[in-house]
């Protein structure tokens, strides 16, 4: 004779061979936390790079016989298409994170079609964020190191604040993309458990 013990702990109900979520499994708290994290990180990354601007006075010598001229030079995110792509991608991901958060909370009936659409869009956000991070990272690296083969000098020695702000925005966006990636992985594990 098998004795079935019934214990309840942290929203989980356990019998001898099965574990089920008492709340019905419709609302996953870790899913909501990751969506809030993705929303916050992509919002801060977009705003941080969107307000990034630095002006410096640079000495420019046109001819060796002429004295150098001091010229104000400004670095803005809008001057590089990779940074524009980065800001727009993070704004899209942030908007989607807010929408998907509302849809996830509102999906109390467990609509499978909506769940699949959210998972597919999470995957699209991973691709969008990682591609924009790669593009902005490549330009940022060019700013830090330059490229001697094409005679592009490094500019981060002059525009240090601008470059540091780009680096922080890239890091935040990377972790925002990682949050979306974890959402996709969780959805894949949930799908695997069902089958």
From Swiss-Prot:
The chain crosses the membrane at residues 30-50, 83-103, 123-143, 166-186. It is found in: Cell membrane. GO terms for cellular component: plasma membrane. The keyword Lipid biosynthesis does not apply. Residues 51-82, 144-165 are extracellular. Residues 1-29, 104-122, 187-195 are cytoplasmic. Keywords: Cell membrane, Membrane, Transmembrane, Transmembrane helix. InterPro entries: CASP/CASPL, CASP_dom, CASPL. It is a multi-pass membrane protein. Pfam families: CASP_dom (PF04535). Coiled coil: none annotated. The keyword Cell inner membrane does not apply. Belongs to the Casparian strip membrane proteins (CASP) family. NCBIfam families: A_tha_TIGR01569. Homodimer and heterodimers. This is CASP-like protein 1E2.
């Amino acid at each position: 004779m098998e004795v079935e013990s019934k214990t309840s702990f942290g929203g989980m109900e356990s019998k001898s061979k099965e574990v089920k979520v008492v709340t019905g499994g419709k609302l996953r708290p870790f899913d909501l936390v990751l969506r809030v994290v993705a929303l916050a990180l992509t919002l801060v990354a977009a705003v941080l790079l969107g307000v990034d601007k630095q002006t410096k006075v640079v000495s420019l010598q046109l001819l060796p016989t002429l004295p150098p001229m001091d010229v104000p030079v400004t670095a803005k995110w809008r001057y590089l298409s990779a940074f524009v792509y980065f800001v727009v991608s993070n704004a899209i991901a942030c908007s989607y994170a807010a929408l998907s958060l509302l849809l996830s909370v509102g999906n109390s009936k467990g609509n499978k079609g909506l769940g699949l659409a959210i998972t597919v869009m999470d995957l699209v956000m991973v691709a969008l964020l990682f591609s924009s991070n790669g593009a902005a990272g490549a330009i940022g690296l060019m700013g830090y190191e330059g490229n001697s083969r094409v005679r592009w000098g490094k500019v981060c020695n002059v525009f240090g604040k601008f470059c540091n702000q780009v680096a922080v925005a890239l890091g935040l966006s990377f972790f925002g993309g990682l949050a979306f990636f974890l959402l996709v992985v969780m959805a894949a594990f949930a799908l695997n458990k069902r089958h």
